[in-house]
Amino acid sequence: MRGKLLIVVLFVVAVAGVVWLAQRRGALTLPGTSGSGGAPGASSGSQVTVTFVYGTEKRDWVEAAAESFRSKHRDVDLKLVGQGSLEAAQQILEGKIQPTAWAPADSLAMSLLESDWRTKNGTALFGTGEDAPAPLVISPLVFVAWEDRAEVLAKLGGGHITWKALHQALSADQGWPAIGGKAEWGFVKFGHTDPTRSNSGLQALVSMTYDYYGRTQLTVGDLLDPKYQAWIKAIEKGVTRFEASTGTFMTDMVRFGPSRYDLALVYESLAVSQLENAQGRWGNLKLYYLPTTLWSDHPAAVLQGSWVTSDQKKAARAWLQHLRSREIQEQALRLGFRPADPAVPLKNQDPSNPFNRLGPYGLQLDLPPAAPSPDGAIVRNLLSMWTRIVPRSP
């Protein structure tokens, strides 16, 4: 009996010795310890959690990129949360969500949050250097329209679809016949998203305002002008519903044809994904570019909130670097995005690249000059003005 007890004691001592040596050499991380503390991607017994909140327009691209990232970074627990840009900005401000990194659809949403965050907390939410906001992919705002309707509007706008031409069309009580269209087309039916909920709707409002004033430098006083407000209201009267999702417009245009929308304002990437599906159903659906380009630059940044640890920042940087790598940037092309990396050409030998084949549908490589984004204070007042003058269904 004593012999058996001695064997058990010796076994326990041996195991304890092995564990002690392993810990001394850093080869074993026990539950509850911080791990090796090395760079993201190093072997570790525990994972660093990175919560990445992103605009849903790039869901397919982000999810595909996450698969390859996870295979290389086993020590990073990457959590993806797709959410509308303006909704996410408000929830971050209110503390309802606390992401490690954020990538809205456009810098407008980021500028709005940065302004509101400074006002509320007196600190910066976004960093500088490697943590500063920088684009992942880019996509311009475009009109997508049925070709026969677009030709009438372009004639009215001197060869282009402009907001002034659209204002005239939407204000006509006699509908399409008043501007040279067919009586069976009825009233002009235009669509864009709710500016208070969706980035593309906010961009639409910015674009209208730039076109009205003929300049991109705005003041709060410009937004208080009654004539300007009446002009905006006349355009919005022709929007039958303010959807929360830009993708809804493309789906509905293909599904219901011009009975639902004659034209809509969407991201180029979304239009590209549906153009070929639409052909032959209701006529030709094509892209038309705004006279001044507004980019959705899909900026991403590691947040400087108190809830983000140094290990999480390291892991988040590795994730964003992965998204900006050449391989992942080239994958974005197949989904209709323009790579943020200027070294990645829009045209290549990939047969699945839409930029190689969709020129006949209006897709262009070279675009009109780009307009700058307004600052956060202008954006906040623009949204306040819109909610005051535009009636919406509950």
Residue spans of the language-model regions?
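Sec/Tat-exported extracytoplasmic proteins
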Residues: F69, H73-V76, K96, A103-D106, ...
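Extracytoplasmic/secreted envelope proteins and their assembly/folding machinery
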Residues: R59-A66, L86-A89, S107-M110, E114, ...
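Ligand-binding pocket segment of bilobal, Venus flytrap-like solute-binding proteins
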Residues: Q203-Y288
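Short helix-loop capping/hinge motifs at secondary-structure junctions, enriched
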Residues: D148-K155, R197, D211-T219, S306-A315
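Ligand-binding clefts/hinges and TM-proximal coupling segments of bilobed small-molecule sensing domains
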Residues: I161-K189, L323-D350
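Periplasmic-binding protein-like
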Residues: G129-F143, Q229-A244, Q279-V308, K313
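N-terminal segment of the mature folded domain
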Residues: R2, G26-G186, D194-R197, L383, ...
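Extracellular/periplasmic juxtamembrane helices and adjacent flexible linkers that interface
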Residues: M1-P31, G305-P394
